[in-house]
Swiss-Prot record:
HAMAP family: PlsX. The keyword Lipid biosynthesis applies. GO terms for molecular function: phosphate:acyl-[acyl carrier protein] acyltransferase activity. GO terms for biological process: fatty acid biosynthetic process; phospholipid biosynthetic process. This is Phosphate acyltransferase. InterPro entries: FA_synthesis, Phospholipid_synth_PlsX-like. Pathway: Lipid metabolism; phospholipid metabolism. It comes from Lactococcus lactis subsp. cremoris (strain SK11). It catalyses: a fatty acyl-[ACP] + phosphate = an acyl phosphate + holo-[ACP]. The gene is plsX. The keyword Lipid biosynthesis applies.
Amino acid sequence: MKIAIDAMGGDFAPENIVKGVNLAKKELSDVTFQLYGDGAKIRQFLDDETAIEIIETTEVIDFHDDPVAAIKSKKDSSLVRAVTAVKKREADAVLSAGSTGALLTAGLMLVKRIKQVSRPALMSTLPTADGRGFDMLDLGANTENTAHHLVDFAILGSYYAENVRGIEKPRVALISNGSEESKGSPTVKEAHEILSAMTEINFIGNIESRDLLSGGADVVVTDGFTGNAILKAIEGTATVLMKEIKSAIMAGSVTTKIGGVLIKKPLSGLKDLMSTDGAGGAAFVGLKAPVVKAHGNSSELAIASALKQIHKMLESDVSGKLVKHFENMDK
């Protein structure tokens, strides 16, 4: 099992990327990690080179680069070389914390989408109060979607939740402005009608955004514009909430500060619950092989989690199962 890694992509590359590999190596003994980038810089942070392949590259795609232009002009970039390795079957999957647009473009151009998948989608596992989490897609790979795109997303998300996260008959829901079947845009209503008739998916109907963090569904489907907005709202709310709690305690009386010390451990647990470090990266589902995007400011723990996520994707052969599913639909 080989995972190609863009070692130069991300705000803290290559340090956090390589340190994340060091952590993942301790648990993933059957994986060879291919690190693409500046070999000298990569070796500064490696514990050792066991199960490591370092592939020298001379270019880096910047967050400000135009994705399509960069893929075409920077062919020796760490990101393009890593994705190309998957295309050539020199690696089984790819991970990058670099430019989202460039990774999605490279994935589509080089790895290719599964036949009959109308649109691949960006999907991530987000936290819930019960610790179970839920998968939401699309998170921004597409800004506009048809009902049939949403139906494909539901299939992709359901397969992922069942095979990678081990959820039996995952509950699939559509984001809408009300839980009633009559609520939603024409696109959502059409998707609702199609999904309701599908026996292979455990479709439970509509879900409102206020119920997401309560664990009302295992897979949540929406268009890319809405999904991206919800994702950023969740991230922002969690950050502000923790900051305001801390500020209120520090600005309070001596009694308040003592109370703050007493609740420090529970608050730490809440922070861990809302953290995405252990959830892995965002998977670009609908492609012929796993392509995973880690957050640009990922910690070494987040990188290790993303690598373990990819390992589960490969071990369960979720991409292969999706290829067969959509091939059968075409018959």
